[in-house]
Amino acid sequence: MEKEINTIGYQLPGLDLLDEYIPESKLSDDEIDSKVEAIRNILESGKVHVKDIQPILGPAVTLYKVFPENSDKISKVRLLLEDSALGLRFKGVRVVTLEDSIGIEIANDHRETVPMRSVLNDDSFRNSKVELPVAIGRTFGNAVKVFDLAKAPDLLIAGATKQGKTEAIHAIVASLLYSKRPSELKFVFIDPKGCEFSVYKRLLKHYLAVLPAAGSEEEEAESAIIKNAKDAADVLDALCVEMNDRYDLLALAGVNNIKKYNEKYKELKHLSNKGHKYLPYIVAVIDEYADLTITISGAPEARAANRSVTNSIIRLAQKGRAVGIHVILTTQRPSASVITRDIKMNFPMRIAFRTSSRVDSRTILDSSGAECLIGSGDMLFYDGVKMDRIQCALVGTKEIDRITKFIESRNE
């Protein structure tokens, strides 16, 4: 599926392609004091004396760490805060248990945008040594959240419509385009709606892994973004074949993962005489997974394609990590029939945007909380161990346009 291209002298995109945002009004001392006083009053009314309340600012939400005078009363603090009317007075209220305190998250009166430029320019991303670094946004203390997709190794993104799922995908893709050369990374984009990923067809000559197709360059570019279940089934099946072929190459080279294989290949270039080649990472991005898996009554071929899509995704999630193949799924239908037990087992890293109910939140995260989010990129990021509340980085349509045009203009 991979296109061999000459990337000698390839230049990664620069930060000048991304917008600089004018800093917005920050959280005022008066707002902080008002919210601290409200928390203190609720606890005092429940006969819990507070030693300290420490605000940790975030771009959209602030975490207020509550330290009761008697540490034995932490559980009572949580109950009081959960049963209080804070959720009626303030937006985005979520109560969390911390190591040394109880935290209460409250939305700021005025949200700050998190520009993609600012997170890509942060030392945590620029100095990252991980294989597939992703700067997804900022959390409390305005710390940039960077994770390694190679270790994820797959990612489920879910939530109600227009809450930030597409923005998260754009942030992930931008992070990877700013850190990996075409020889190191390929994408597969599956877009049943046919509108979310069309801008990425400009990456065809450099970053897209596609099935061989007859036709003009225009026809090839048009088919580079997969738009229906039948084509998705074919591409995902081809990825499974690629995965098995890669396992054969690793076995022949006597290694057990893609990083070791590529290091050995660099040292022993003559391996190409035995069928060996440098293996780029492959990231399959699948938008609105539910649209690809809905069974269509009376259409056997469509039902077969639906089943094939699901089976291939599970296989890739189960075995793809070692050979550098990773899957990102999104859905706006977080029901148990879509996010099945098999999906959850094989996608331990999950992002939830605002959901319409506590049930939907639990379907995604095995925990409530996503129903409390305030939308517009406010997310809960679960890495399989702990949960972080993050404001997603924003990369606008015009910025994506500039990035893809820049890459399209590079030498093949």
List each model region and its residues:
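Short, conserved phosphate-binding/catalytic loop or strand-edge motifs used
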Residues: 58-62
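Short, charged/polar, Gly/Pro-enriched secondary-structure boundary elements
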Residues: 72, 109-116
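Conserved RecA-like ASCE ATPase "motif II neighborhood" in helicase/translocase motors
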Residues: 265-271
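Charged, low-hydrophobicity low-complexity segments
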Residues: 1-52, 274-276, 406-412
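Surface-exposed, low-hydrophobicity interaction/linker segments
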Residues: 29, 33, 67-68, 347
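Generic alpha-helical secondary structure
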Residues: 25-36, 74-77, 81, 400
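AAA+ P-loop ATPase mechanoenzymes
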Residues: 57, 78-89
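P-loop NTPase catalytic phosphate-binding loop
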Residues: 1, 6-13, 50, 63-65, ...
